[in-house]
Swiss-Prot record:
Catalytic activity: 5-amino-5-(4-hydroxybenzyl)-6-(D-ribitylimino)-5,6-dihydrouracil + S-adenosyl-L-methionine = 7,8-didemethyl-8-hydroxy-5-deazariboflavin + 5'-deoxyadenosine + L-methionine + NH4(+) + H(+)
Residues binding [4Fe-4S] cluster, per UniProt: 20, 24, 27
InterPro entries for the chain: Aldolase_TIM, CofG_family, Elp3/MiaA/NifB-like_rSAM, F420, rSAM
Protein name: 7,8-didemethyl-8-hydroxy-5-deazariboflavin synthase
SMART domains the record matches: Elp3
Pathway(s) this gene product operates in, as recorded in its UniProt entry: Cofactor biosynthesis; coenzyme F0 biosynthesis
Annotated function: Catalyzes the radical-mediated synthesis of 7,8-didemethyl-8-hydroxy-5-deazariboflavin from 5-amino-5-(4-hydroxybenzyl)-6-(D-ribitylimino)-5,6-dihydrouracil.
Cofactor note as given: Binds 1 [4Fe-4S] cluster. The cluster is coordinated with 3 cysteines and an exchangeable S-adenosyl-L-methionine.
Family indicated by similarity: Belongs to the radical SAM superfamily. CofG family.
Residues annotated as transmembrane: none
Domain of life assignment: Archaea
Organism annotation: Methanoculleus marisnigri (strain ATCC 35101 / DSM 1498 / JR1)
Keyword S-adenosyl-L-methionine: yes
Length: 331
């Protein structure tokens, strides 16, 4: 009998800007254009170098959606020498590759052409679907229109980009909405074969936001959503939970087979009140299962060659490194 495997990625989390065109009712990440709203290139490079020294394999670039739509942002970025946020993330992706880190970008809504450009320097990319429902929390967030998000996930499939998506629980959606969201994701994967993993993420209320007093999903509700995801999604799509946002050890038996990216250096800037578990805690969460490190591009996509030629030497080198005999998971 094969031992169950739970995977994770060792990453660096780089929030390139907190400026965002959306105003979601549950978000504490967004800020206006102001001093310090852009991660300085020197800080980004220091973070990449320190993370590589700690054995990380992934550089997770996250930033607010369409920050250039917010007045004053592009002028501020221009003073750093970049025309727009995509120029900046492209430059830092190259810097990550040079330091033996595989880039994964989560940028919010991107056009087909923008996805195609970033595909050259990213091993994988992501966009949370969140929900197919029209919920009040997204009333002031044009980028959270479900049709717009589905179109981007589909475009990523057309471009054969290994992709992460997911659902967000507790933002005003119903159980039927969750099922519909998962079926949409499953259908996109059956058509394009590009969804690596689906995150089942629970909403965490933030002080000072419109939803600070909203009810949160309990463990049974989260577990039921995980089980539903495992039932609906194709077998080759991983079901992931963020191990810092819920009682992961209680949920692991519901169908979870991935614990996402965790960092030995950087915090979760979207949920800063929830620290990442470190390796010993991940082992405890995995229980009797084998805890196995992975890259941000899953093995089946490496085998299929679904990556830019620029990334091939690094992908091969890192895949060999994490598979080396005697290497402890995450060492």
């Amino acid at each position: 009998m094969h031992r169950r495997v739970i995977t994770f990625s060792k990453n660096a989390f780089l929030p390139l800007t907190t400026v965002c065109q959306n105003r979601c009712g549950y978000c504490c990440f967004r800020t206006p254009v102001r001093e310090g709203c852009v991660m300085a290139p020197t800080e980004a490079i220091r973070t990449l170098e320190a993370s590589a020294a700690l054995g990380c394999t992934e550089a997770l670039f996250t930033f607010g959606e369409r920050p250039g739509a917010v007045p004053g942002f592009n002028e501020m970025l221009g003073r750093l020498g970049y025309a727009d946020i995509l120029d900046y993330v492209y430059h830092l992706s190259l810097a990550a590759i040079e330091r033996d880190l595989l880039p994964h970008t989560n940028a919010g809504i991107l056009t087909y052409a923008e996805l195609d450009r970033l595909r050259e320097v990213n091993a994988s990319m992501g966009l949370m679907l969140e929900t197919t429902a029209d919920v009040p929390a997204h009333r002031n967030s044009p980028g959270k229109d479900p049709a717009v998000r589905i179109e981007m996930i589909e475009n990523a499939g057309k471009l054969s980009i290994p992709f992460t998506t997911g659902i967000l629980l507790g933002i005003g959606e119903t159980e039927d909405d969750r099922e519909e969201s998962l079926r949409v994701i499953a259908d996109l994967h059956r058509r394009y074969g590009h969804i690596q993993e689906v995150i089942v993420q629970n909403f965490c209320p933030k002080p000072g936001t419109a939803m600070e007093g909203a009810a949160v999903p309990g463990p049974d509700e989260i577990g039921a959503a995980i089980s539903l995801a495992r039932e609906i999604l194709p077998a080759d799509v991983a079901v992931q939970i963020p191990p810092n946002l819920a009682d992961a050890s209680r949920l692991i038996g519901c169908g979870v087979n991935d614990l996402g990216g965790v960092s030995p250096l950087t915090i979760d800037y979207v949920n800063p009140e929830h620290p990442w578990p470190q390796l010993d805690e991940l082992r405890r969460i995995a229980g009797d299962a084998e805890l196995r490190e992975r890259l941000c591009i899953y093995p089946q996509y490496i085998e299929k060659g679904r990556y830019s030629p620029l990334l091939e030497p690094l992908i091969r080198r890192l895949a060999e490194r994490i598979a080396a005999p005697g290497r402890d998971a995450g060492a």
